[in-house]
Amino acid sequence: MIDTLPLIDGGPTHRLMQRIGLLKQRGPELARGALVLAVFAWLPMLVLAAAAGHLTGGVPVPFLFDYGVHARLLFSLPLLIVAEVVVGPRLGAAAARFLERGLVKPAEVPRFEQAVAQALRIRESAVLEVVVLVLAYVGSFLSLGLSFSFQVSRWDVLVTPGGPRITMAGIWSTFVAVPLYQFLVYRSLVRMLNWFGFLWSVSDLDLQLVPTHPDRAGGLGFLGGAHRPLGVFALSVGAVLSGRYCTEILYGGSTLAAIQAPVAVFVAVMVLVCMGPLVVFLPQLMAARRKGLVEYGALALRYAAEFDRKWLRGGAPADEELLGSGDIQSLADIGGSFERIEQMRPVPFGLKDVTALVAACLLPMVPVLATVMPIEEVAKIVLKVLG
């Protein structure tokens, strides 16, 4: 029996991180590795900013008060490392269940294996990871260019009469910290796209769905649960936005009302990104539902007619009692199966899966509330929502 198909859990970078001890399966060791990488990216900027007098003052935006940087490197970056260990195995196990549960018909197994092979080729592509690294540096230089356009000195870029000038802390940020973070983000997106491509290929197969399956998704309900760990990625992105909004509210004059719409858009986009790809199974699920309703409807009609003839029209043997007869239970079972088919979902995930993802998106926004209200009130709101 195949327990997992590691379609995204691997590749050159993954093996490198394993070799240097960043990726460990056990909690404490994994947390330690993630913390080491975060400190490697963040601590030199702290030291260099302090040496230049830009730690808590000296410029309008000193290092310690740039909450977006701290959220990105001390919270979001470690979460991306955690996601490397958490998400891959869950999705790999989900891929194996297509075969384990007989969802792939024997005639479709070769095409399923082709989809697996394609995903593995993408996972192992060193060229693709080099492209991701180049994009990370391009993104870092674009961020630096944006900083040069500001009219206010920051810990990373100073506005001088001769023009903007990058600081030593800014050099580390531009050439090490930001590219490292963006590489992990872009790589996570590539891994997700690889998985979504696999799902697209599988959705094109003639799957053996069971319309009466208790998961109300023809047997594909496990996919919704497998996508819940993607909430770690949503949590990571949300942390960056939270740091940015805290800075805007505390130093940019923004308000809580002004960020409500962007937060709502962020949540909607993350739900679409993390759960939207499962919609590719909608045509097959709806076809299975229609076919099931027709077949079980015909079966229920025949059985109900026989039940009617036997027990209401005098067709039952004289020595057979209705009480205790298995006919009633069989009629109820057929009715229950028909109702279950009627309740089939058009997608292989439910409200609980979406709710878990929304919670992961909103959890990092708690510090934003703390910028405009007492921490006690924030705690009450959080406890009320969780309760």
Protein language model regions, located:
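Transmembrane-helix bundle segments that line or gate the permeation/cavity pathway
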Residues: 1-210
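Loop-to-transmembrane boundary segments
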Residues: 22-43, 110-140, 171-177, 212-238, ...
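Membrane-interfacial helix-loop-helix connectors in multipass membrane proteins
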Residues: 55-64, 147-171, 242-265, 376-387
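Alpha-helical membrane-embedded segments
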Residues: 74, 172-191, 237, 261-281, ...
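Juxtamembrane inter-helical linkers in multi-pass membrane proteins
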Residues: 97-115, 155-162, 196-223, 282-319, ...
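Long, internal scaffold/assembly segments composed of regular secondary structure
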Residues: 183, 187, 193-261
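Final/C-terminal transmembrane alpha-helix of multipass membrane proteins
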Residues: 353-380
